[in-house]
Amino acid sequence: MGRDKKERYITMEKKLVIACDHGGYELKLALISHLSESGYTVVDLGCDSPESVDYPVYADKLCCALNRGDAPLGILVCGTGLGMSIAANKHKGIRAVCCSDTFSAKMGRVHNNANVLCMGGRVVDAERGCALADAFLQAEFEGGRHERRVVMLNALDEAK
């Protein structure tokens, strides 16, 4: 791999997009701080205050950024993580997992090749949220028998 390609690969691996609604605003700020300190380039797609907003708008912004190739992975935060997960999974090519434990966050990447982690600002505190993000971002897709299953999931996108 040439130097430029290797540098771009490393840069993209440490880059992610993040978005939230009002229910996830405080947790999003904690995640950005933690991940930036951990060496990630974090692109914040909003929301920008704890004022009430509609979560599908921010899920859409993040999923469109991923599908454009702006970053390989994303994190969405709302009150429970559920609404963001539902909205994100409406997008072709997105495999979003809603997690409140580190094992599920890790396995979402390892077995399902998830590209979006969703969590709830009213479900997990900042410490747990940061641990979820670390587990998700440090895990790698295992491939093998799981690759076949991800191909099946991708085929469902095409069937729509």
List each model region and its residues.
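Short hydrophobic/aromatic-enriched beta-strand-loop microsegments
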Residues: T41, I94-D101
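Helix-adjacent hinge/juxtasegments
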Residues: Y58-V97
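A short beta-strand-loop structural module common to alpha/beta enzyme folds
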Residues: T41-S52
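Phosphate-coordination loops involved in phosphoryl transfer and adenosine-cofactor binding
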Residues: E13, A71, N113
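Short, Lys/Arg-enriched N-terminal segments with co-localized hydrophobic residues
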Residues: G2-T11
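Glycine-rich phosphate/diphosphate-binding loop of Rossmann-like nucleotide-binding domains
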Residues: V17-E37
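C-terminal binding/interaction regions
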Residues: V17-A19, G23-G24, T102-K160
